[in-house]
């Protein structure tokens, strides 16, 4: 496998820490050891997160092409668009963000706080569009790209989640290589890695990266899209493409993609009672915050899998914390009593 052939623009602090979740593990019976890899703390650029790790491989391509404007898309409280805005500001580039109405949630300040507030503060041209949720290519995004060109700019197209992009899976191939180096220092290997999945390239990159040592199917995706068939297809397609690009040396198949569909409801961006319980439990036991859209759902999935005995006793499970906490302000009513 050859990740090193791809140029990388450093936007993160370096390898992210692995933190034992001792109190949460004990609360759940102590038979499974839980750890968190803190990609939510990976950068000083507007709180960072998993997209910042991905952007390290997209930015060299944008600069090589002479692009002057980063153009991306997400929901109103998109972590992706906030991270793209931060990177654009850091590099002195322009930024156009298409923010669609992906979440069926209504709050007076939903489009004025959290991620979208930060994007505006960092100088991004934020364009609100009423279209609903979908992880595919969007006309609103293509229109924004065309508008930049019409104004004489040179846009660089960054799809939702950085995912359906030729380089979108590389960052989390690097995540797997980083974990292997940390495992050597820790003196053990993780039996499972739990990760939230929506647009797919985070899990896809992990699948490829961990396939290098036979652990592709130990990456447990927790669907948060509530459209798992589409997410599964995209994970597999991106993983296959990424495996070819990094010269993995074997094909990625559907057996390598594990996606738990039980925790994504009721729909994208809306938490269920299990999501909220997991957010509060992790916060109160560990001081680790998660969000109602992504990490709260993957945390719920991991907690329930422990409770149901789906991880064998003695397992060491690594929770990939991808970020998302800046969206909490947009859901303040749900947590008005903590």
Curated annotation (Swiss-Prot):
Domain of life of the native organism: Bacteria
Family annotation (InterPro entries): ACCD_DCysDesulf, ACP_carboxylate_deaminase, ACP_carboxylate_deaminase_bac, TrpB-like_PALP, TrpB-like_PALP_sf
Modification N6-(pyridoxal phosphate)lysine, positions: 51
Cofactor(s) needed: pyridoxal 5'-phosphate
Annotated keywords: Hydrolase, Pyridoxal phosphate
A Pfam family: PALP
Active-site residue list: 78 (nucleophile)
UniProt keyword Hydrolase present: yes
The keyword Hydrolase belongs to this UniProt entry's keyword annotation: yes
GO molecular function: 1-aminocyclopropane-1-carboxylate deaminase activity; D-cysteine desulfhydrase activity; pyridoxal phosphate binding
UniProt-listed GO biological process terms: 1-aminocyclopropane-1-carboxylate metabolic process; amine catabolic process
EC numbers: 3.5.99.7
Function: Catalyzes a cyclopropane ring-opening reaction, the irreversible conversion of 1-aminocyclopropane-1-carboxylate (ACC) to ammonia and alpha-ketobutyrate. Allows growth on ACC as a nitrogen source.
Family according to the record: Belongs to the ACC deaminase/D-cysteine desulfhydrase family.
Cross-referenced PANTHER family: 1-AMINOCYCLOPROPANE-1-CARBOXYLATE DEAMINASE-RELATED (PTHR43780:SF2)
Subunit structure, as described in the record: Homotrimer.
Record's protein name: 1-aminocyclopropane-1-carboxylate deaminase
Name of the gene: acdS
